[in-house]
From Swiss-Prot:
GO terms for biological process: diaminopimelate biosynthetic process; L-arginine biosynthetic process; lysine biosynthetic process via diaminopimelate. The active site is at D68, E133 (proton acceptor). It is an enzyme of class 3 (hydrolase). It comes from Shigella sonnei (strain Ss046). Its EC number is 3.5.1.18. This is Succinyl-diaminopimelate desuccinylase. CDD domains: M20_DapE_proteobac. Zn(2+) 2 binds at D99, E134, H348. Homodimer.
Length: 375
């Protein structure tokens, strides 16, 4: 199949860019962008490669994405080696095909076609690409955004190429994401022999009523844009492994995915009040990995909806479900942020794949969005 989008996707898949190793992917993209007049600024931090590229001036539409991928798992279970892209029955197989090397290829080819037709476009077209989205994300998009904000860089619209679609390209567009807050809680007791409980203080017994009340809380009811806030216990550990020792500590890790109805400070205050109510001795550590954000109907959402309707003849759902993405960092710049990408049914799985025709369609959608906002 001879198609510039498919060919570029295959070239990217062949580079085993396990996070945060870029494995040469960005050099490939940079060469293509510089060839059509983009200025490219490499913005590497620690072990992570990033770049910021732009062409033109004025209102800015940025395309954001990541070159890194998650490990393939057991390569023997793949129908073909995970870093050897293969097309079978119209499906392109390979690690990163859907998340998100196909999107990157579609973005770059769309930019090439757009610039060829609009060499003197009125707005500024930009790219923000990182090699660490799948792992810690500490030195990726967040650091680039901080650097851009420090010099008052303008960013009006941002399209993130995360695989947002469920069954067909564009059936779901993400116009926001929930916040994510993790609590690492240690309940302190006194270790001792199970036969002498009066000489010990069992933190598991102490914490049970607290945890029972915690999991029963209805944090909010959500709103028209966000589902209700959810809290899930992810890890719980206590004990020495012996059946005759009362543990001295209980560790509990729980995560909140929260809507715009709450702030992280409101959640923290309620948890701490509950700990005090149950008179627990505790140590607590919080990790806020992202605030909730929402892009209401406006020029970017309208342009994305228009592109999907034009090429796929469907009206996309605007949703804020799912995990976090790098859009949470970009939203800090005051930009309208929307995610549009391929079908996500196989992301992070063995035999990750994407419909090759979908990537061609995605490139046309991206180009139409460019034409509506910065032509």
């Amino acid at each position: 199949m001879s198609c510039p989008v498919i060919e570029l996707t295959q070239q990217l898949i062949r580079r085993p860019s396990l996070s945060p190793d870029d494995a040469g992917c960005q050099a490939l993209l940079i060469d293509r962008l510089q060839a059509i007049g983009f200025t490219v600024e490499r913005m590497d931090f620690a072990d992570t490669q990033n770049f910021w590229a732009w062409r033109g001036q004025g209102e800015t539409l940025a395309f954001a994405g990541h070159t890194d991928v998650v490990p393939p798992g057991d390569a023997d279970r793949w129908i073909n080696p995970p870093f050897e892209p293969t097309i079978r029955d119209g499906m392109l197989f390979g690690r990163g095909a859907a998340d998100m090397k196909g999107s990157l290829a579609a973005m770059v080819v769309a930019a090439e076609r757009f610039v060829a037709q609009h060499p003197n476009h009125t707005g500024r077209l930009a790219f923000l690409i990182t090699s660490d989205e799948e792992a810690s994300a500490h030195n990726g998009t967040v650091k680039v955004v901080e650097a851009l904000m420090a010099r008052n860089e303008r960013l009006d619209y941002c399209l993130v190429g995360e695989p947002s679609s469920i069954e067909v390209v564009g059936d779901v567009v993400k116009n926001g994401r929930r916040g994510s807050l993790t609590c690492n809680l240690t309940i302190h007791g006194v270790q001792g022999h199970v036969a002498y409980p009066h000489l010990a203080d069992n933190p598991v017994h102490r914490a049970a009523p607290f945890l029972n009340e915690l999991v029963a809380i209805e944090w909010d009811q959500g709103n028209e844009f966000f589902p209700a806030t959810s809290m899930q216990i992810a890890n719980i550990q206590a004990g020495t492994g012996s059946n005759n020792v009362i543990p001295g500590e209980l560790f509990v890790q729980f995560n909140f995915r929260f809507s715009t109805e709450l702030t992280d400070e409101m959640i923290k205050a309620q948890v701490l009040a509950l700990l005090e109510k149950h008179q627990l001795r505790y140590t607590v550590d919080w990790w806020l990995s992202g605030q909730p954000f929402l892009t209401a109907r406006g020029k970017l959402v309208d342009a994305v909806v228009n592109a999907v309707e034009h090429y796929n003849e469907i009206k996309p759902q605007l949703l804020t479900t799912g995990g976090t993405s790098d859009g949470r960092f970009i939203a800090r710049m005051g930009a309208q942020v929307v995610e549009l990408g391929p079908v996500n049914a196989t992301i992070h799985k063995i035999n990750e794949c994407v419909n090759a025709a979908d990537l061609q369609l995605l490139a046309r959608m991206y180009q139409r969005i460019m034409e509506q906002l910065v032509a």
